[in-house]
């Protein structure tokens, strides 16, 4: 059983099998963040959290399962020395990627349709939800190196934790967002937010490990 919101629920289990991590990939992306809504905490993990919502649209130009697009969001961040995402909503347009997310990282991936350019106007549409972004990059292109950690709740109170490490180039951006869905409309704020665009990058998502608590 995966920790998820209704937009990422999926009863299907016969997805094509994906290779194990690490998953290296070339990426372009738009990321944005905002102060969490009053309702966001009920869709986040238990334990200490920070009231910051982090979301992103990602274009994987290549990967172990081929090219695909992705949208994901964390309603709040886990409070830690380095804050971590907890992702109850994530969708892709690759069946093997759905398998990989669910099997290797406990990420509740579902299938969706994508259109546009992540560095400009982009959209993701599922069965009963949609997210649209318009990224407006500003300022110079700068180098970036770091990682994003996600820690997914699993039965028994533990979490499954993994890190995606990135090296590439980015620009500051203002990202305008519209979201519809039974829960997305309650915690993914519409409007224009601070963000960045990854204009080019190499990313590698490593194997997850179970930790007793965060």
Please name every model-derived segment.
Residues 29, 61-63, 77-214:
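Internal, well-folded beta-alpha domain core
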Residues 70-72, 85:
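Short, surface-exposed coil-to-beta transition loops
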């Amino acid at each position: 059983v995966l920790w998820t919101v209704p937009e990422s629920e999926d009863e299907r289990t016969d997805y094509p099998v994906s290779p194990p991590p690490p998953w290296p990939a070339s990426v372009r992306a738009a990321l944005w963040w905002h102060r969490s809504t009053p309702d966001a905490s009920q869709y986040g993990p238990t334990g200490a959290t920070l009231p910051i919502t982090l979301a992103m649209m990602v274009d994987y130009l290549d990967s172990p399962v081929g090219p695909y697009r992705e949208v994901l969001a964390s309603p709040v961040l886990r409070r830690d020395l380095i804050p971590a995402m907890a992702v109850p909503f994530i969708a892709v347009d690759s069946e093997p990627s759905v398998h990989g997310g669910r099997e290797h990282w406990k990420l509740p991936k579902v299938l969706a349709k994508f259109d546009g350019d992540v560095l400009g106007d982009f959209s993701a549409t599922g069965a009963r939800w949609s997210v649209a972004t318009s990224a407006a990059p500003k300022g110079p292109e700068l180098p970036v190196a770091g990682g994003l950690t996600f820690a997914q709740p699993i039965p028994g109170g533990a979490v499954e934790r993994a890190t995606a490490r990135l090296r590439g180039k980015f620009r500051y951006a203002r990202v305008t967002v519209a979201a519809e869905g039974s829960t997305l409309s309650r915690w993914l704020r519409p409007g224009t937010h601070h963000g960045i665009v990854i204009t080019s990058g190499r990313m590698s998502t490593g194997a997850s490990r179970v930790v007793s608590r965060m």
